[in-house]
Every structure is written in C-alpha cells, then in structure tokens.
Design a protein with these regions (language model features):
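Catalytic cores of glycan-processing enzymes that make or break glycosidic bonds
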Residues: 1-259
Length: 259
C-alpha cells in the first residue's frame, strides 16, 4: 500500500537503472505480487498469518452454517485444559491453577481456560510472569490451536486449521459445510489476487523496455499463468516443476507445449 502511494517508484527507479545494462530481468517469487503472507505484529511464528489481500469469513456466514456465539468462540479462541499444563508442571494441580490465573480466565467451574484479553500475541506469553519454560512453550502451542483468527470484519482460517482441536470436534457434515464456504472464499480471493497482480506487475513491466521473466516454479494459484501471459511476462520452465498439477499423478508437460 505504501509503495502504491509512491506510484511504485522504488521498484521503477531500480528497473530504469538496470535497463542501462541489461535487456532482461527476473521477478523473483512472482507469486508474492499476487498475494503475500502477512503475520500479526508480535507473533513469533507465521502460523497465525494469512494471505494479503484476503476475503474474511463473517460472523453471519458462520451462523448460517449453524455455529452459534459459543461455538464461534470455540472455533476462534484457544481453549486450554488444566491437565494440559499440569502435565508440564510436575502434575501440580494447585500450582498450575496459580500459573494459569496470571494470563488466563477460567470458564466457570470447568477445567478449561481462555487467554485474557491482555494477551495479544505469543510474545506476550513469553514475556509473562511465569518462570517455567515448559509451561510457556505449551501455552504458546495452545495459543496457535484454533481454527479461526478474529480480525476486523470477520475471521480467517489458519493454514493448519485441519490439525486443530476445534476442527477435530466438528462432525462430518459441519466439516463439509465449512470446506464449501472456504472454497467459495478462495474463488473470491483468486480474483482479488489477480487484480492486485495486474496492477502492480502492469506498472513495472511498462516502466522499461527490458524483457520481464518471472520465477513461477511449483504449484501456483489458478490465475497466475493467464496474468503472466496477458502481460507478456516469460515463465521459467524447469522440467521437474513443469507439470500438470491438477491431473492424477501430476504428469510432466510435453516439451512441445512449453511456451
């Protein structure tokens, strides 16, 4: 967004300088011009990140799938069982309660806890007044144990949502409905990514007469080949990566079909 405000001059000026010496240039990891992985500030890992731009899942959409307020909380807030922390705290039940009260709130009389609102990222867990490394490590693992992350305007699924406790608790019908919703969101995001790439790459390619080549190896998003073709950006064709990823066994593409 900041680069756009400056009319992408940071990139353009470098391409103009390079054009004095070269006839062709390579755009490394061109997929990042379509969408980039954004990580919440303060997170120590990329697990709770999302693509940017992205299409959020709204509360209303989750309610239409049959998830009420409490179940949406279950999907989006890490729930920690006392015994999970007790196991790394010498099986000290009362001592574990004392530690958890520092950064968590107990749900009624259940042996189940939610992080306090003051805990915004896993760095806050590492910085809290708990001495045990093992307790902190387990708490940060549980911090990432959620299907959804709440943001302004809705929620987004974490990349590993199918490995979470919340996902395992859903029945097959709920999993199917949620997967269908994500598929619809991905279709919309594909259009967002295409629009962004056409804007940014279009500005760069027309800034000089150099031939543009893109590093687009591996499995990519659906709109990528068309955008590169429309903007006359050459692809890198490496035999082991040039495959039909959508077909069974992902066969290699024949040399005659190379662009």
């Amino acid at each position: 967004k900041n680069l756009k405000k400056a009319d992408y001059s940071w990139w353009k000026n470098r391409l103009i300088s390079a054009s004095k010496y070269y006839d062709m240039y390579r755009i490394d990891h061109v997929l990042g011009f379509f969408r980039i992985w954004a990580i919440p500030y303060g997170e120590c890992t990329a697990v709770l990140g999302h693509t940017e731009p992205f299409q959020p899942i709204t509360k209303e959409e989750l309610e239409e799938l049959g998830f009420d307020k409490e179940r949406i909380r279950w999907l989006s807030k890490p729930h920690v069982e006392t015994r999970t922390i007790e196991e790394v705290n010498n099986f000290d039940y009362l001592g574990t309660h004392g530690l958890l009260h520092k950064i968590m709130d107990r749900i009624g009389d259940e042996e189940l806890w939610l992080f306090k609102d003051s805990i915004k990222t896993d760095q806050d867990i590492w910085d809290c007044d708990i001495e045990s490394y093992y307790v902190k490590e387990k708490l940060t693992q549980k911090w990432r144990d959620r299907m959804l992350v709440e943001v302004e305007g809705g929620y987004y699924p974490i990349w590993t949502y199918t490995k979470t406790t919340a996902w395992a608790s859903l029945n097959n019908a709920e999993k199917a409905l949620f997967s269908e919703l994500l598929a619809k969101k991905n279709e919309k995001m594909d259009k967002l990514w295409e629009k962004q790439a056409r804007t940014v790459l279009g500005e760069l390619t027309k800034s000089t007469k150099m031939i543009a080549c893109a590093e687009d190896l591996g499995a990519n998003i659906e709109c990528l080949p068309k955008v590169l073709g429309d903007l006359d950006i050459r692809s890198l064709c490496v035999v082991r990566w040039k495959r039909d990823w959508e077909k069974p066994a992902q066969p290699f593409v024949d040399f005659e079909d190379y662009p």
